[in-house]
Amino acid sequence: MTKGKSSPSSGKAPPLKSHGPKRTLQKKVVVVSKEVLRSQLERVNALASNWLTRLGRHKASKKQRVIHSASDCSGHGSDLIAYRLLGLQSQVQPVMMSEVSRQKVLLHQAVAQECGWNYDDHQVIDMFLRKEESMKTADVYVAGYPCPSYSKLGKRQGVSDQRGLLTLKGLEYVALCRPKVVVLEQVKAILEKKHSQIWNYILKILNKLDYVFDHQVLSTQDFAIPQSRPRVYILAVAKEICAGTVKLPEKRSEKVDLHHFIQKDKTGSEVLQLPRYEELLGSKMWRKGYILDVGSSEKFQAAMTNCAPCLTHTRLGQGGYYIPKLRRRLLLEEAGALQGVPKKVVRAMQRAAEEHKLPARTVDASLGDAMSINVLASVLMKGLTHSRLVQFSAQEDHWRLVANGPDAATLSDRLFDGTAWAGPGLK
């Protein structure tokens, strides 16, 4: 018998196949030359040094009728969904977005229309190709840069990788236009010593641009959605219009249980035996993100604490998340809910994918790339309040106040429909 394989009579189950390569983020690395990197660093630094003579300071206003928004590495439009859930679709006007993936641009179009915006008003542009004169000034700038350049699943070349250089291209826009509010997101690995140079550079540029800012690691599970997805967020507000010290939103003290987000009435025919997973992956299998709802096993119930692992582009794109108790894969709407995306938006993305004949699981993969809507909306709420562009009350901090129960799982849907709140309490 060949070593490593078990025969049907051996009593051992054959090993389960891993769904996709383990280190797919290492593909397609384009190394940036030292000259290009030095030139980009110098350009951003120069723009940050002379912003006051070029732009002048923002003027504080009691109420701004239209808020112009721009985003880079826009994906399917997480910022638009967040604005809609905050009830700002009539106040926010998107003016610029960047995205090189044709598939995501098509999904972004569907999301914009579903959220109530005319997609024709968007300026869609490649960050590497846009010219200074083509950049539209915005009040709010949101960017979640590609993670492979910093993630432990990638080669971690930082800004020496072309995808990592997008961080500097985004900072170029910030230095050139100096939006009133800036929201930046990246995997927490950027805080490690290996990437300390670029991290300190980002903070230095924000200081030069006279921003008041805060940075912190926030996870999706900190805001009423049970997914372990730690990300570094930077919230910066122009000093002259900032009301006090900038603080990122407070984390919830109470976690929400995963089972509220799983549709238990839907089961599948894929019989997945948990002991076989235990044998294959070992006692820390839950960290690898292959299964959810591990409450069906006492061993993993305590380890996972009723929380989904980080939903990634690769595994969502390959259907790699299983719910053993229900004998099926994670549904697309469930993945959307665990990212804070309303069902109506997920369905709009599905329709667009079918209409344009996009590859299977395009929507799944896009969800895995995106910022979690609950976290982004909470951060935007703080930024808009600190900048006095919009005033939110404490009772509108939906994700911090919602109870651990079915209401948490449907909160995004109800906010999208405008039915979540009646005065200070949940309907």
Regions found by a protein language model. Give the residues of each.
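Intrinsically disordered, low-complexity glycine/charged-rich regulatory or linker segments
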Residues: 2-64, 392-427
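Alpha-helical recognition domains of nuclear gene-regulatory proteins
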Residues: 82, 173, 205, 379-383
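C-terminal target-recognition/interaction regions appended to catalytic cores
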Residues: 51, 276-427
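Short amphipathic alpha-helical interaction elements and helix-loop-helix interfaces
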Residues: 89, 114, 208, 344, ...
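Class I S-adenosyl-L-methionine
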Residues: 130-140, 148-317, 325-328
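Core alpha/beta nucleotide-donor-binding catalytic domains of modification enzymes
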Residues: 33-181, 188-192, 196-200
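Eukaryotic short linear interaction motifs
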Residues: 78, 105, 243, 318-320
